[in-house]
């Protein structure tokens, strides 16, 4: 591993650790073909929230993310799968909110039994929609992986660059957590990939969980 990757980005000592963690998760997601939205990060990073060095590099990082996103959107059937994926997410949220409101209504305002059963029905629909949403999310990732397996040279260097950025950000997170006396257990990371140095896996992906839960290792940890 090169010295540059192991060297943390220069940031102020009291850096926003949550912003740093979320950025790691965002970029790692692109490497696993889960496309998050970089927009919420753009203004903060450009303004120097994560230091001048990363602010200067952000343009290249974002351009690399967009290369992957643009390629993925050209995959056959991708748009229809995304629409279904989004619809299921919206349905799950709507059923959850409706069911929760009915439970509150039954508990505090009325004892109508049919409202109780209706709330349970909505919550059941929400659970079913969430399960299908998770299944479809994985199906999307598989379809994208199959595409890149067939086109292994496509943006290979871009993906390697982004992986190096994630690795360096992980070392950066560990450096500033140690500098500020923070407990890694209180700042876990959610990652789709686990092939990074300097992390410890706490939980592996499950049926409804597609990410690893990890914590960074500090310098004095094995």
Q: Language-model segments: which ranges?
A:
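Transmembrane alpha-helical hairpins and terminal membrane-anchor modules
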Residues: 80-157
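Generic low-complexity segments that are intrinsically disordered, proline-rich and/or Lys/Arg-biased
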Residues: 39-41, 53, 77, 185, ...
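Charged, low-complexity cytosol-facing tails and large interhelical loops of integral membrane proteins
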Residues: 6, 10-35, 150-222
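Membrane-proximal, non-transmembrane alpha-helical segments
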Residues: 45-89
């Amino acid at each position: 591993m090169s010295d540059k990757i192991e060297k943390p980005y220069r940031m102020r000592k009291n850096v926003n650790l949550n912003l740093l963690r979320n950025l790691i998760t965002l970029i790692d997601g692109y490497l696993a073909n889960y496309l998050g939205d970089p927009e919420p990060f753009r203004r903060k990073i450009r303004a120097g929230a994560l230091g001048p060095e990363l602010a200067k590099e952000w343009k290249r990082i974002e351009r690399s993310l967009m290369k992957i996103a643009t390629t993925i959107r050209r995959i056959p059937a991708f748009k229809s799968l995304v629409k279904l994926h989004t619809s299921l997410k919206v349905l799950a949220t709507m059923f959850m909110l409706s069911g929760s409101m009915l439970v509150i209504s039954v508990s505090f305002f009325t004892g109508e039994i049919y409202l109780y059963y209706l709330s349970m029905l909505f919550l059941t629909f929400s659970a079913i929609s969430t399960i299908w949403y998770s299944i479809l999310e994985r199906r999307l990732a598989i379809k994208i992986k199959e595409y890149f397996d067939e086109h292994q040279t496509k943006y290979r260097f871009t993906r390697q660059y982004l992986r190096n950025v994630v690795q360096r950000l992980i070392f950066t997170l560990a450096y500033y957590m140690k500098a500020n006396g923070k407990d890694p257990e209180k700042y876990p990371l959610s990652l789709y990939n686990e092939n990074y140095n300097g992390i410890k896996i706490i939980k592996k992906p499950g049926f409804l969980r597609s990410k690893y839960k990890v914590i960074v290792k500090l310098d004095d940890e094995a």
